[in-house]
Amino acid sequence: GLKDWWNKHKDKIIAVAKEMGKAGLQAA
């Protein structure tokens, strides 16, 4: 289910989210 998918991918998702957050702050 969704929780299994999240547990499998969360590290990558979090890393990407952090990178996007940094880019957003720099662009602002």
UniProtKB/Swiss-Prot annotation:
The free-text tissue note of the record is: Expressed by the venom gland.
Which residues carry the post-translational modification Alanine amide, per the record? A28
* Molecular-function GO terms, alphabetical: toxin activity
User: A single GO CC term, please?
Assistant: extracellular region
Write out the annotated subcellular location: Secreted
**Does the record's keyword annotation contain Secreted?**
yes
Task: Provide the alphabetized UniProt keywords.
Answer: Amidation, Antibiotic, Antimicrobial, Secreted, Toxin
Its BP terms in the Gene Ontology are:
defense response to bacterium
Could you tell me what this protein does? Shows a broad spectrum of activity against both Gram-positive and Gram-negative bacteria. Also has antimicrobial activity against S.cerevisiae. Has insecticidal and non-hemolytic activity.
Name of the protein in question: U1-poneritoxin-Da4a
Q: What is the source species?
A: Dinoponera australis
